[in-house]
Amino acid sequence: LGDVYKRQVGGRVGSDGIHGATFSSLELTEESPSSAVQIGDPITQKKMLDMILEARDEGLIQVITDNGAGGLSSSVGEMAELTGGAKLDLGQVPLKQAGLSSWEILVSESQERMTVGVRPDDCEKFEALASLHEVEATAVGEFTDSGAFVVHHGQTPVAHLPIHFLFDGCPQLNLDSEWSPPTHLPVETPELDEEGMGKLLARLLARPNVASKEWWVRSYDHEVIAQSVIKPFCGTNHDAPGDAAVIAPIQGGTQGLVISNGIAPRYSDIDSYAMAAASVDEALRNAVCVGVDLDLIAGLDNFCWPDPIESSKTPDGRYKLAQLVRANRALDDVCRAYRLPCISGKDSMKNDAMMGGEKISVPPTLLFSLLGNHKDVRKAVSSDFKKPGDAIFIVGETHQELGASELAFMLRDEGSGGIGGDVPDIEPERNMKVYRALASSMKNGLVSSAHDCSDGGLAVALAECCFGADSGASIDISPLQSDCSGLDDWGALFGESLGRILVSVRPSEKEAFEKSMEGVCCHYLGLVSEGDAISISRDGEKVLLGSMSEMRDSWKNTLHGGGL
């Protein structure tokens, strides 16, 4: 890097975010400090990002990293490995408040800050660009080849650490993992007539994992600068759930960006491999629903895990570590099969707390986020049914997979049976063929709506699509028996098999759509209907009948912000 000066760019350092990295690696208690949580400033972030991108395009940046875990101590320390040393003067660092001690300035993780390396000849241009964007860019030190990371606060020495110690001084842990598949009581399903099944679906729609998140989402503005094409909610009343966001960042342009997520922590109770695989597939499936370009996608893996290190407080550490190993194997297997590179991610490995003398741990969880290109946002597809008379299809195979499903947990919570053992299996090659065929149909304008089947299975997905159109639906699930000879009504309606998307098509496009989906699993189920009823049959007999208005009330009144 030669003679390169360090610049802190963006927000100021404050007392927020101090020991944030430590906080995320320790057991939570009532004494855990709130100051470890960073305070966001999206306006400063936006100004800084615009300035950084312009500086990049002008060739003014030699090296850059964000001030995440450990703040300046990590960002400067990490980049110092490139040159073999660095000098840092904490007295030059802009502060939110006076009185911070040297160590607090060094480790604070206050948000919206980048550490940037700039050549001396480019410093004037860099600072002028920062001024233009109203962004602070302060010289805080320089890179050296001294072999040490040297920190001062003005004239006062703070730290002098050999570079080799920073990167090689801590030996890597050698840990043992031990996987033993857990056993659970089987799912026990009740005997219900069609109206009883309708009421059960209404209860399922009220479950927190399924219920409308509208009150939460609308607490924050998702319409800033009017770039959103597919929004969090869609349909006649703008309250039906969308699968993914589509934005058009270039005004007047037709190219867009798709952002989606997948998360399935329930499956970890049976197998964390299935959990991670389902999370990746859900994120991709959600993106497919809006018309993503499957050849331009990338992922971010965010792990949220209970303590996986065996100790007196965590006697099952070997098992939790084995869960982590299995989740990473799934991430590797599925992302390679989908040709889906992971470009970033995060982990938090100590999500445990003592409450009332009892240890509470989060379920092993992978939140998988996906970014993708949309070639033409004018052809983006939303999840809501459009018109009565439209044909309803399901693409992808349905199997008898109720293990750890939302239905299984609801029935268990109501006092009936366990969560079973048959978690959804994944066939990424088969799924990708379905996704590509559907993407081609969307490109040709054959698809009116698309919504993924995930929490609650086909029945929940069907109800959510009806919410968007203020409509009903009448379908026959008999064709699904060709996917799985042992498929019963419960598996067909509430199983959460991966790789499935519920689609509606205009009557005039039905034949063309069926032709475009030849060679992959695609079943015609029925029609969008006028009125308030959702009706599901199998082999000529009604298996579920319910009122959409009652289901909407159940769905919207769980997470409603205290009735506001």
PLM regions: where:
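Glycine/proline-enriched, intrinsically flexible loops and inter-domain linkers
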Residues: K6-L564
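Short, small-residue-biased leader/transition segments that mark boundaries at the very start
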Residues: L1-Y5
